């Protein structure tokens, strides 16, 4: 039996927008992000990133992805931050940041190191450059993960519930970093349970349930005047 995890998704993200994706667990939010950067492949539809075609459906109904190298290059336009920090435990913080730009993008090592130090300053962790991940708090590790994604110079940042595995007191420091990125007009798609962030920082909120976008709109409309019954029930539960 075929299970459609996502269906009927129609989503436009403009440059500089911050999209908050909310909804109950199992509604397809994380899968949506994974489809955007090709961690999951779609079986119908079109994905266009920064004006470039990543995937399209042919006249025969078959999904065709851009060729290998081109596909990877387009996918690299998106930085991804996961629930779990996924830092390399055997590398220092600085080494974690420079690994992919040097090895994957073949950029100049000395220049990448300078840029990485600037990014660590940006996320408030300059003094942790030579520290190993195990010596950091969860909030610090997640901020390193954000800096590591930014080191690849993405056009778009994808966040998959970046604070869900953090204690409440550590959540604030990660959200603060994300808020600063939003103020710098970084294009962001954020799957989150943090309704305050969605309400205050997002330019658009998308509510998903059962693999579909049930409602989308400006934060003030979604939170103060929700039309969809599922959204109304969801907000009653999470905003108690």
What are these regions (language model features)?
Residues 168-170:
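Helix N-cap at the start of a conserved alpha-helix in ABC-type nucleotide-binding domains
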Residues 216-217:
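ABC ATPase "signature
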Residues 157-160:
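Catalytic Walker B motif of ABC-type/P-loop ATPase nucleotide-binding domains
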Residues 131-134, 152, 184:
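Conserved signature/switch motifs of ABC ATPase nucleotide-binding domains
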Residues 22-24:
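The feature captures the beta-strand-to-loop junction immediately N-terminal to the Walker
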């Amino acid at each position: 039996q075929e299970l459609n995890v996502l269906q009927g998704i129609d989503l436009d993200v403009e440059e500089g927008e911050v999209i908050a994706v909310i909804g109950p667990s199992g509604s397809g939010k994380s899968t949506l992000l994974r489809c955007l950067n090709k961690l999951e492949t779609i079986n119908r539809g079109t994905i266009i990133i920064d004006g470039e075609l990543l995937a399209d459906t042919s006249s025969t109904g078959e999904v065709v992805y851009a060729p290998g190298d081109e596909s990877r290059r387009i996918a690299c336009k998106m930085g991804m931050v996961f629930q779990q920090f996924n830092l390399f435990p055997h590398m220092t913080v600085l080494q974690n940041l420079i690994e992919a730009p040097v090895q994957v993008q073949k950029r100049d090592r000395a220049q990448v190191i300078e840029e990485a130090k600037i990014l660590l300053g940006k996320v408030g962790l300059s003094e942790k450059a030579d520290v190993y991940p195990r010596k950091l708090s969860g909030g610090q590790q997640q901020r390193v993960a954000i800096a590591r994604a930014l080191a690849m110079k993405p056009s778009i940042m994808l966040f998959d519930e970046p604070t869900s595995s953090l204690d409440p007191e550590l959540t604030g420091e990660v959200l603060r970093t994300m808020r600063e990125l939003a103020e710098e007009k970084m294009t962001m798609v954020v799957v989150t349970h943090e309704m305050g962030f969605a309400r205050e920082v997002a330019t658009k909120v998308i509510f998903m349930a059962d693999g579909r976008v049930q409602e989308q709109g400006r934060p003030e409309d979604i939170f103060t005047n929700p039309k969809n019954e599922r959204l109304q029930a969801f907000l009653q539960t999470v905003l108690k």
